[in-house]
Amino acid sequence: MNQAELQRHMEEVSLQFFQKEFRHQAVFNARLRTTGGRYLLKSHNIEMNPKYLENFGLAYFIGIMKHELCHYHLHLEKKGYQHRDQDFRELLKKVDAPRFCATIPREITMHEYTCKSCGKSFLRQRRFNVNRYRCGSCGGKLIQTGSKKIYTENA
């Protein structure tokens, strides 16, 4: 999906679920990390996280669009648009939009180091120079034995 398709989808979702036009811009923002989308109060534009489309599919992504459009339409109508406001919660229920996003699985590379003397194994996220450090248990020399990718649910 590109920017033009996102704009078209946002306009269609707005008309279908809110019976109101979306007259501003919807753009992808890949720098968003822990949120599915963001409504900008000053410009009235909506930024969407493309990682949620890749990881969870179009149906889930449309739910995030509906959530952001709730903020958008309530703010323009000068009603309570924040998560804690009653107007916002009622509109979320009416259009069946999610209140929160699921976390995106994150890929972490773990580096494995092993002591030559005692054979103890260490896992670290950051690589380090094995010539500068020794085993904490026996003082032996370390060697890097490999690295592996781990997927976590924490973002």
UniProtKB/Swiss-Prot annotation:
InterPro entries: SprT-like_domain, SprT_Zn_ribbon, Uncharacterised_SprT-like. Zn(2+) binds at H67, H71. GO terms for molecular function: zinc ion binding. The active site is at E68. It comes from the Bacteria. The keyword Metal-binding applies. Keywords: Cytoplasm, Metal-binding, Zinc. Binds 1 zinc ion. Its cofactor is Zn(2+). GO terms for cellular component: cytoplasm. Transmembrane segments: none annotated. The keyword Cell cycle does not apply. It is found in: Cytoplasm. One of its GO terms (biological process) is response to stress. Residues 7-145 form the SprT-like domain. NCBIfam families: PRK04351.1. Belongs to the SprT family. This is Protein SprT-like. It comes from Listeria monocytogenes serotype 4b (strain CLIP80459).
